[in-house]
């Protein structure tokens, strides 16, 4: 079976694990029948860490791509996003409408032709 690589990413204040499970289960419901699902995570808190939890609960392979802040400084998150998009087939982003990092992930995934699902949520004020 071929792999289907999906990024689960989003804002760092995202904490609604039930919503993440519902969205991801729906998005992957057909692919899981014909592919090995691989969850790709940037390793940040919030949506990324919930995506890792989801992968473990569902028995999916997990690939972690943590940003190398020491090496790349402020550009590390953007470099990580590009690295993840280069190996992914799709991207599910949980976005508060403000996070620049999540917006960058959405933009780069879209530019690279990935199937992108954006889940807007209110965020924490």
Task: Identify what each model region corresponds to.
Residues 2-3, 14-125:
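Acidic/glycine-enriched connector segments
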């Amino acid at each position: 079976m071929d792999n289907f690589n999906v990024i689960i990413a989003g804002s760092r204040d995202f904490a609604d694990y039930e919503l993440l499970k519902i969205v991801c289960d729906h998005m992957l419901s057909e692919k899981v029948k014909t592919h090995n699902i691989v969850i790709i995570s940037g390793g940040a808190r919030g949506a990324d860490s919930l995506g890792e939890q989801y992968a473990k609960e569902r028995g999916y392979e997990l690939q972690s791509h943590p940003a190398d802040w020491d090496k790349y400084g402020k550009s590390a998150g953007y470099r990580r996003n590009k690295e993840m998009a280069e190996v992914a087939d799709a991207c599910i982003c949980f976005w508060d409408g403000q996070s620049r990092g999540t917006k960058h992930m959405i933009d780069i995934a879209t530019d690279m032709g990935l199937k992108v699902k954006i889940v807007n949520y209110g965020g924490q004020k």
